[in-house]
């Protein structure tokens, strides 16, 4: 199924307000996720992990910065990082230019996060620590911006 740039719906992420677009939301894919993330200067996405999903992070524009566990990585344009399910990870941007990431993950794991109707999703499974904490490289930065 062809997906064109016109098919993408860009929106801010829930917690960190990072612009992102889901390539596969209209395809019905049950096993794969693929999303673009455009990190503005001096921003970060959530610190999180997964239950069984591996993710491949690929930099399309700019120079990517990422923490995986205790390690901080610098990822050049057209470079990538494979992250296992149980590793804490966070992409961030400590530069003055936007950074565009393509993040592909499999298998999809939404069913593992679904709790009962009364309790909802168990977010501690993917956010074992404070998800909105910023990396030390962004000390003194206010992100997400106050509305």
Predicted features and spans:
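Short acidic-glycine-tyrosine-enriched beta hairpin
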Residues: 70-85
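A short hydrophobic beta-strand segment most commonly corresponding to one strand
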Residues: 82, 96-115
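Short glycine-/acidic-enriched loop or helix-start segments at secondary-structure transitions
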Residues: 68-69, 77, 92-93, 112-114
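Short histidine-centered beta-strand/loop micro-motifs
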Residues: 24-27, 36, 45-51, 92-94
